[in-house]
């Protein structure tokens, strides 16, 4: 029986490249001359630091632009509120890996409500979809692309 997995993953290399490109762009921008501002990547969290809250907003725009250039979906990023400590402002942007249980249940419900002849099962941080026909599986993929979910999805492990 044909099957595939629905996952939500981020390419760590592309994320690192986007952060490094953002740092380079920050150094070359005129409005950030003589300003103490930086991007710092630790695992799947990017920490932004600047002297003003307004500058943090500009830095988030720079980061989003570089993520788009590198092919990383910005919907996977969850930005926390700005924090003022001392003379600097800080903001953290966390990148979600894997499907949370609530989102996985929502995906399974969408598939079942579509009345397509496939079975969907939650397996850890992914959803496995199996069906008798390859066309049914492709229909599920198209339906999920159309659905407006809060996290980007990838389809892998396609088996005949």
UniProtKB/Swiss-Prot annotation:
GO terms of molecular function: nucleotide binding
UniProtKB keywords: Nucleotide-binding
Keyword Nucleotide-binding tagged: yes
Keyword Transcription: no
CDD domains named among the record's database cross-references: YajQ_like
A Gene Ontology term for the protein's cellular component: cytosol
Domain of life: Bacteria
SUPFAM superfamilies tied to this protein: YajQ-like
Classification via Pfam families: DUF520
PANTHER family, per database record: UPF0234 PROTEIN YAJQ (PTHR30476:SF0)
Stored NCBIfam families: PRK05412.1 (NF003819)
Role summary: Nucleotide-binding protein.
Family per record: Belongs to the YajQ family.
Protein name: Nucleotide-binding protein VC_1508
Source organism of the structure: Vibrio cholerae serotype O1 (strain ATCC 39315 / El Tor Inaba N16961)
């Amino acid at each position: 029986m044909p099957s595939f997995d629905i996952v939500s993953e981020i390419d760590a290399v592309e994320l690192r490249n986007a952060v490094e490109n953002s740092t380079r762009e920050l150094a070359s921008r005129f409005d950030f001359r003589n300003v103490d501002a930086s991007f710092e990547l630790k695992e799947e969290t990017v920490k932004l630091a600047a002297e003003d809250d307004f500058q943090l907003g500009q830095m988030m725009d720079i980061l989003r632009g570089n993520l788009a250039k590198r092919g990383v979906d910005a919907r996977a990023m969850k930005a926390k509120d700005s924090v003022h400590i001392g003379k600097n402002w800080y903001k953290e942007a966390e990148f979600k890996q894997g499907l949370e249980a609530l989102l996985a249940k929502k995906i399974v419900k969408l598939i079942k409500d579509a009345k397509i002849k496939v079975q969907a099962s939650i397996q850890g941080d992914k959803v496995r979809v199996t069906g008798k026909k390859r066309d049914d599986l492709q229909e599920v993929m198209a339906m999920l692309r159309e659905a407006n979910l809060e996290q980007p999805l990838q389809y892998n492990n396609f088996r005949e």
